[in-house]
C-alpha cells in the first residue's frame, strides 16, 4: 500500500492503518530502535509506542514523508527509553544528591 493510502486510513481512524504501517515500515522502525537500544524487547516496545504516537498525532497532522515521520518518532522514543535505562543503571539519583548538598551549603552561609 502507498504511503498516502496508509495516511488516509489514519484519518479514517481505521485500525488497518497500524497493520499496513507495520507491514511496510515495521522492519525499518525496528532497525532504528535496535541500533539505539540493542535489546529485542525494548526495540519492540519502542516500535509499538511509535505506532501509538503516530495514531495520536496524524489526524490533524499530515506528514509529508511518512517514513521520515515514523523514523523520527522511533528515534526519539528509543533515545528516551535508553536515557531512562542509563539513569537507572547509575542509581537514578542524578541531580537529587547535588540539590541536598547545595541546600546544606546555603544553610551554612
Task: Locate predicted features.
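Sigma70-family region 2
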Residues: 11-12, 38, 48-66, 85-86
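Short, charged helix-capping/linker segments at alpha-helix termini
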Residues: 11-20, 30-49
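Alpha-helix N-cap and coil->helix boundary residues
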Residues: 20, 41-46, 65, 69, ...
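Residue-level preference for hydrophobic side chains embedded in well-ordered alpha helices
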Residues: 21, 25, 29, 50, ...
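Arg/Lys-rich amphipathic alpha helix in sigma70-family domain 2
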Residues: 75-93
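Internal acidic/polar
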Residues: 88-109
Amino acid at each position: 500500500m502507498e504511503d498516502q493510502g496508509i495516511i488516509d486510513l489514519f484519518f479514517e481512524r481505521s485500525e488497518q492503518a497500524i497493520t499496513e504501517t507495520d507491514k511496510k515500515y515495521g522492519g525499518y522502525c525496528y532497525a532504528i530502535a535496535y541500533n539505539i537500544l540493542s535489546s529485542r524487547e525494548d526495540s519492540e516496545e519502542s516500535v509499538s509506542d511509535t505506532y501509538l504516537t503516530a495514531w495520536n498525532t496524524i489526524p490533524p497532522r499530515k506528514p509529508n514523508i511518512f517514513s521520515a515521520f515514523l523514523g523520527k518518532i522511533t528515534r526519539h522514543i528509543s533515545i528516551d527509553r535508553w536515557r531512562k535505562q542509563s539513569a537507572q543503571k547509575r542509581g537514578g539519583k542524578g541531580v537529587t544528591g547535588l540539590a541536598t548538598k547545595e541546600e546544606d551549603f546555603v544553610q551554612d552561609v
